[in-house]
Design a protein with these regions (language model features):
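Polybasic, low-complexity association/targeting segments
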Residues: 1-9
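Domain-scale recognition of functional cores that engage charged ligands
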Residues: 10-57, 62-181
Length: 181
């Protein structure tokens, strides 16, 4: 194990009739009924591959913080200068993120003149606080523990969602098995 496991090289992608079987509606229903009838005799397990740290997910935001000239340019100027396509999408939906209110609240407590800032300055401080190791450190946390879905009653992480999925479709005889890598 000192050298790890050797890489696997794939010959080609799986496609329908070459590694993937396409079922008709009737075949699908038949196999689904068969599975439901037999699942109490099986030990079902939901397999969840590791997603790792969120560093790749927030890479474009780290690049923004490293390259953005906060004192001399607006975010729009940065977007145009870098031809960044991810940042505008992120900013357009920023208020929909389940973690938005918590981070915004922290930014308000950190930035004394928050209410007098222009929108792009608020966005800069939001991103900086979200990624800062002193506060939320999102880029260095496992994706599985980040706030993921916002429900009326609570905010769920991916780990919680996997547990719910496991209970829903990978349960046999009132027992669920879950394997996280």
């Amino acid at each position: 194990f000192q050298t790890g496991i050797s890489k696997m090289y794939l010959a080609r992608p799986a496609k329908i009739d070459d590694g993937i079987l396409k079922l008709s509606g009737d075949e699908f229903n038949s196999k689904s009924v068969f599975f439901d009838e037999k699942k109490s005799t099986l030990k079902l397990k939901k397999f969840v591959p590791a997603s790792g740290a969120a560093s790749r997910m927030f890479k474009f935001l780290n690049e923004f913080l490293n390259d953005f000239d906060h004192e001399n340019e607006t975010i729009n100027a940065y977007i145009n200068r870098k031809k960044d396509k991810n940042l505008p999408t992120f900013l357009a939906g920023i208020e929909k993120f389940p973690f938005f209110e918590e981070i915004k609240s922290k930014v308000k407590s950190l930035v004394p003149n928050y209410y007098s800032l222009e929108s792009h300055e608020k966005s800069y401080h939001f991103i900086k606080t979200m990624l800062s190791s002193d506060y939320f450190d999102f880029a260095n946390k496992p994706k599985g523990v980040l706030d993921f879905h916002k429900y009326q009653s609570h905010i769920a992480t991916p780990v919680e969602e996997h547990l719910n999925e496991c209970a829903f479709y990978a349960t046999s005889n009132s027992v669920s098995h879950l394997h996280f890598t």
